[in-house]
């Protein structure tokens, strides 16, 4: 019993000792209530929507950081911190070109601030205003295209709206989503709009919730419809890809049977041994002017889309009088075929093979959609030419192909 009590007392003593030690360690080594010195030799370089400030640091040994306090807009305060290991900080988020006062504070390791050093910045025109000034809207099939320059590379949203009732009530209809981008040139197409003249409104917003003036335009989208697949037919040219037979034939017509998410083997699939770009040819029954198209990839084993023969880089060609007599036609030199475009599938996450995020899966499930270049002639026959699949080879796998146009 005495030994047990001895052990208990010893453990209690050690616990108290350790607890006291922890309290001591959590206490500041020293409290410095003296404010540090001021920054000096302050210089400003004004840029679009922001300013870069350089300065000389005070000589205080316990200087922790420099703080800048300022308002991006009246009543909207923000602060920026810069380590003691740099003499530069950037104040950004300005929504105008007015003069703004920035207060610079030196802060020591105890959190004590110096008095403020005031400097005036005069930011240049913010990126969202530059983008709005360059915004151009043009009617296209089933909607409109929008293009603008974003020379500052800011994170911007172009917000489209439409007055469906003609009474100034601006709304976003189905398919009319915001366009988000930080590219130096922002380009997008909005579809699913009726071919009637209406007023559309556009504004540009940045990540600080600054909004540009609204651009209002009246336009009539070009008539567009989903092409009727019941007239489509297989036409096999001599050097077209050979379809696969593995538990059943993977016929070409599965590309237009209306099933975007088929099981095996109800998908178009070609032999995997191909060593050159492969082609598939379709007779649409009549000539059409194409506006856009969608490819639904096949969901492979393991629940993956961005694998194996699903298209990654490919071309689409058009013709009205293909030469069927040539035993080995070369689409690149055959004058009866015209290249309509080269297309690249982007994996939203950019993750490696067999790693697919929910965004990757949603993009593939909904179908990879592309716009054709404007000004194309009408064509009856099309060829899909696979340049590279997700395996880095040439065989083709497509669950469904859908075309829009007139």
Language-model region placement:
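Disordered, acidic Ser/Thr/Pro-rich linker "stalks" and the adjacent N-terminal cap
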Residues: 217-285, 298, 360
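Aromatic, loop-rich ligand-recognition surfaces of beta-strand-rich domains
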Residues: 260-331, 364-406
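C-terminal motif of bacterial Sec signal peptides marking the signal peptidase cleavage site
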Residues: 16-19
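Post-signal peptide N-terminal segment of secreted/secretory-pathway proteins
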Residues: 42-127
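Pro/Thr/Ser/Gly-rich low-complexity, intrinsically disordered linker/stalk tracts
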Residues: 21-61, 113-154, 213-236, 404
């Amino acid at each position: 019993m005495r030994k047990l009590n001895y052990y208990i007392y010893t453990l209690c003593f050690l616990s108290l000792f350790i607890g006291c030690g922890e309290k001591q360690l959590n206490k500041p080594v020293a409290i410095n209530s003296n404010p540090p010195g001021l920054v000096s030799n302050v210089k400003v370089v004004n840029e679009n929507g922001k300013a870069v400030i350089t300065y000389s640091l005070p000589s205080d040994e316990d200087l922790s950081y420099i703080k800048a306090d300022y308002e991006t807009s009246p009543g909207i305060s923000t602060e920026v911190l810069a380590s003691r290991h740099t003499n530069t900080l950037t104040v950004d988020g300005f929504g105008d070109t007015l003069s703004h006062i920035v207060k610079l504070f030196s802060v020591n390791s105890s959190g004590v601030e110096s008095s403020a050093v005031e400097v005036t910045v005069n930011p240049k025109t913010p990126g969202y205003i530059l983008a709005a000034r360059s915004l151009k809207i043009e009617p296209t099939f089933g909607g409109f295209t929008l293009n603008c320059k974003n020379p500052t590379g800011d994170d911007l949203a172009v917000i489209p709206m439409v007055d469906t009732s003609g009474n100034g009530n601006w709304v976003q209809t189905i398919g009319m989503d915001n366009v988000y981008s930080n590219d130096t040139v922002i380009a997008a197409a909005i579809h699913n709009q009726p071919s009637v003249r209406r007023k559309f409104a556009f504004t540009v917003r940045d990540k600080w919730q600054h909004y540009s003036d609204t651009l209002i335009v009246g336009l009539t989208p070009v008539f567009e419809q989903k092409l009727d697949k019941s007239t489509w037919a297989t036409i096999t040219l001599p050097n077209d890809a050979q379809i696969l037979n593995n538990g059943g034939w993977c016929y070409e017509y599965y590309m237009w049977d209306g099933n975007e998410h088929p099981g095996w083997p109800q998908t178009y699939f070609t032999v995997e041994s191909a060593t050159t770009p492969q082609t598939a040819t379709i007779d649409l029954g009549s000539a059409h002017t194409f506006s856009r198209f969608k490819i639904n990839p096949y969901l492979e084993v393991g629940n993956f889309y961005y694998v194996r023969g699903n298209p990654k880089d490919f071309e689409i060609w058009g013709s009205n009088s293909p030469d069927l007599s040539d035993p080995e036609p070369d689409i690149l030199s055959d004058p009866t075929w015209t290249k309509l475009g080269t297309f690249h599938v982007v994996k939203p996450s950019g993750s490696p093979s067999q790693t697919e995020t929910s965004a990757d899966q949603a993009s593939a499930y909904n179908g990879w959609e592309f716009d054709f270049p404007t000004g194309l002639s009408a064509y009856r026959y099309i060829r899909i030419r696979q340049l590279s699949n997700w395996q880095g080879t040439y065989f083709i796998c497509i669950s469904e192909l859908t075309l829009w146009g007139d």
